Design a protein with these regions (language model features):
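Intrinsically disordered, low-complexity Ser/Thr/Pro/Gly-rich regulatory segments
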Residues: 2-111, 115-314
């Protein structure tokens, strides 16, 4: 056989000096890449199972009083996947720039179990031990942690109080060309991602009030007579088919709204479904998928905003 392109199919082909070594090296590199990918997938699966087992062990030992311990486990999960520019705080109350006005009935959220915060430029208003008051401009995501049961009515009220918070348009900061005030057109406000974390599967229809629902399943565990079949995390986005342009509109409220038919079309092609990761058996690697999806949305928010106004008299 004379065609060199067919040599790999013919065991009788005589290789020139060095050709076999070169092909072996290429095969070795390919094998190493495959092994590396396999190890990454395996490690994420192991981490996922470890998180689930810790959550159920904590729940078995402490029962419904395990709130603090449970939050610590979820916190460790988020610390493992979000960039170091963010800090993850517990026992947070989120405020906006109008909360001090007597005529303003809103302005402070209910307590947030975990908040993913960019504290680089936006200061805490008040911090005393575990208790923190943080301006809405600094908050990229909020997390509500529950065990096996959840009350949708109270959770809806919890999310609504966060959505009611408004960002200031009077902040002042120095940019390259001098002092500027107010937000940039591409980001007029921030709307934190809302994430629910719980055990089992008996948390119905929460994906219509949360951006992500993260449920921990432990094999053979039984919750409300529903038996879990495997140990894993189930990640449920509010709508995995929402494109990145619509996420930008939802999270940042740009002004004017993006126009279709421009470069925005490129972002319209990408949805959270594009960031799903599967193994060879077509099983979703949930934690790795969540890593990519969450961080893509954090990059769209890209806090901090130049919007925070210190408290002042009206």
């Amino acid at each position: 056989m004379s065609d060199s392109s067919d040599r790999r199919f013919d065991p009788q082909v005589k290789f020139k000096k060095g050709e076999r070594t070169e092909m072996n090296n290429e095969t070795s590199k390919t094998d190493k890449k495959k092994k590396l990918i396999k190890n990454i997938v395996h490690n994420y699966s192991q981490l996922e199972q470890s998180i689930v087992n810790q959550l159920y062990m904590t729940n078995d030992i402490h029962g419904p009083t395990a709130g603090g311990a449970r939050e610590d486990i979820w916190r460790q999960m988020f610390e493992a996947i979000v960039p170091k520019k963010f800090v993850i705080e517990s026992s947070v109350f989120i405020i906006d720039s109008k909360f001090h006005k007597e005529e303003y009935k809103r302005g402070v959220s209910q307590e947030v179990d975990l908040a993913i915060i960019d504290e680089t430029y936006t200061p805490y208003i008040f911090r005393y031990g575990r208790l923190k008051f943080v301006p809405i401009e600094a908050v990229a995501a909020v997390v509500e942690c529950k065990s096996k049961n959840s009350d949708k009515a109270s959770l809806t009220n919890w999310t609504n109080q966060i959505e009611y918070l408004t960002t200031s348009t009077e902040g002042i900061a120095r940019m390259q060309h001098g002092l500027v005030t107010g937000g940039v057109p591409a980001q007029q406000k921030t709307s934190p991602l809302k994430i629910f974390c719980g055990l089992g599967s008996k948390h119905d229809n929460l994906d219509d009030i949360f951006d992500f629902v993260v449920l921990a399943h432990q094999k053979d565990a039984k919750i409300d007579e529903v038996k879990m079949t495997e140990t894993k995390l189930e990640i449920i986005p509010s709508d995995e088919n929402t494109n990145l342009s619509d996420w930008h509109q939802k999270l940042n409220s740009p002004r004017p709204a993006p126009k279709r038919g421009s470069e925005d079309d490129e972002f319209s092609k990408h949805t959270l479904k594009n960031y799903e990761v599967y193994d060879r058996d077509n099983n979703n690697i949930s934690l790795l998928t969540f890593n990519f999806q969450l961080n893509q949305l954090l990059m769209i928010i890209n806090n901090p905003l130049l919007l925070f106004t210190p408290l002042k008299k009206s």
